[in-house]
Swiss-Prot record:
Localization of this protein: Secreted
Gene label: Tnfrsf11b
Claim: Protein transport is one of the keywords in the record: no
Record's keyword annotation contains Metal-binding: no
Disulfide bonds: 41-54, 44-62, 65-80, 83-97, 87-105, 107-118, 124-142, 145-160, 166-185
Keywords in alphabetical order: Apoptosis, Disulfide bond, Glycoprotein, Receptor, Repeat, Secreted, Signal
Annotated source species: Mus musculus
Residues with glycosylation annotation: 98, 165, 178, 289
Protein name according to UniProt: Tumor necrosis factor receptor superfamily member 11B
Biological function: Acts as a decoy receptor for TNFSF11/RANKL and thereby neutralizes its function in osteoclastogenesis. Inhibits the activation of osteoclasts and promotes osteoclast apoptosis in vitro. Bone homeostasis seems to depend on the local ratio between TNFSF11 and TNFRSF11B. May also play a role in preventing arterial calcification. May act as decoy receptor for TNFSF10/TRAIL and protect against apoptosis. TNFSF10/TRAIL binding blocks the inhibition of osteoclastogenesis.
GO molecular-function term, one example from the UniProt record: heparan sulfate binding
């Protein structure tokens, strides 16, 4: 009989436990020695521990966990759990310990947890590409490149890339690609011309230099009237005013003026005079020889809309190695509504500090930005701007970026 009663009580307790979990706070059974009755008490919430069981006169007393300890679920324990003291080797803190959560650690970038160790992500060999990027919990997943795709580098991030369609660039296929090599297209002067950059870094710095420290009334109209050559029409000026902020309007106007007057002697002279700047930028950036993966990482670190892997690969096909980074920065600027490229690079460099990006490249980018902001370039911009517009607005105070 006693055995039967024990079984019945256990079943009853299970039923009570199941039904009470459906309500908050969940309940638990407690024998009250004062009355001799079983009471339904509230469990303690996450972040607290049980100080006193409930009675017929008062509810359960729960108090906050002390520092460096926690509880992460509804419970009836009279103590909290100590937080893990430190993260293991090659791990960093993902979430600090608090009263409701233990300290959460994860493997540093480029590694994943395998049992107790942070191992490096697998690198896919040439002929294979990444189909699932590695995470702090999972290794990289590689797969052989299917027909029509290739990967020519060892990488833990780069996917297989589609073979170049030579006809898209007006070229002939002279050697079919395979899993490790791209199609080889016939060389053609037209291909190098397609790398054209609408506004170089130096021209952009020069055009942005022309923005006054304080915008004066009708500044854009004054500038339109002062520029030599074919005038930018009123409709275009109004469109610039509608679409862009006052600080951005000067850059947009000068960019459009340059496009309309590219065959004018004045524009040719300005471009020739900026060659000093361009050659210095090439000295800093022209020998970077970045891989597809590195170009992708740099473009990903820029704010705003991103340059796609396909655009990066297309740039690598149509531009010389010394032009690829500059072309991609130009594409980023256009895609993001002519945002300031140098400000975008400053943002990117802050984020690249935490990644395994080549320090020689970040150093070159910083040197380039310092050069474009230098006093020597300020004097050159000032000289060119005053030559371009004559003496009509020399009184306007010009600020260098």
């Amino acid at each position: 009989m006693n055995k039967w009663l024990c079984c019945a009580l256990l079943v009853l307790l299970d039923i009570i436990e199941w039904t009470t979990q459906e309500t908050l706070p969940p309940k638990y059974l407690h024998y009250d020695p004062e009355t001799g009755h079983q009471l339904l008490c509230d469990k303690c919430a996450p972040g607290t521990y049980l100080k006193q069981h409930c009675t017929v006169r008062r509810k359960t007393l729960c108090v906050p966990c002390p520092d460096h300890s926690y509880t992460d679920s509804w419970h009836t324990s009279d103590e909290c759990v100590y937080c893990s003291p430190v993260c293991k080797e090659l791990q960093s803190v993902k979430q600090e310990c608090n009263r409701t959560h233990n300290r959460v650690c994860e493997c540093e970038e480029g590694r994943y947890l395998e049992i107790e160790f942070c191992l490096k992500h697998r690198s896919c060999p040439p002929g294979s590409g990444v189909v699932q990027a590695g995470t702090p919990e999972r290794n990289t997943v590689c797969k052989k490149c299917p027909d029509g795709f290739f990967s020519g580098e060892t990488s833990s991030k780069a996917p297989c890339i589609k073979h170049t369609n030579c006809s898209t660039f007006g070229l002939l296929l002279i050697q079919k690609g395979n899993a490790t090599h791209d199609n080889v297209c016939s060389g053609n002067r037209e291909a190098t011309q397609k790398c054209g950059i609408d506004v170089t870094l130096c021209e952009e710095a020069f055009f942005r230099f022309a923005v006054p420290t304080k915008i004066i009334p009708n500044w854009l109209s004054v500038l339109v009237d002062s520029l030599p050559g074919t005038k930018v029409n009123a409709e275009s000026v109004e469109r610039i005013k509608r679409r862009h902020s006052s600080q951005e309007q000067t850059f947009q106007l000068l960019k459009l003026w340059k496009h309309q007057n590219r065959d004018q002697e004045m524009v040719k002279k300005i471009i020739q005079d900026i060659d000093l700047c361009e050659s210095s930028v090439q000295r800093h950036l022209g020998h970077s020889n970045l891989t597809t993966e590195q170009l992708l990482a740099l473009m990903e670190s820029l704010p705003g809309k991103k340059i796609s892997p396909e655009e990066i690969e297309r740039t690598r096909k149509t531009c010389k190695s010394s032009e690829q980074l500059l072309k991609l920065l130009s594409l980023w600027r256009i895609k993001n509504g002519d945002q300031d490229t140098l400000k975008g690079l400053m943002y990117a460099l802050k984020h690249l500090k935490t990644s395994h990006f080549p320090k020689t490249v970040t150093h070159s980018l910083r040197k380039t930005m310092r050069f474009l902001h230098s006093f020597t370039m300020y004097r050159l911009y000032q000289k060119l701007f005053l030559e371009m517009i004559g003496n009509q607005v020399q009184s306007v105070k010009i600020s260098c970026l």
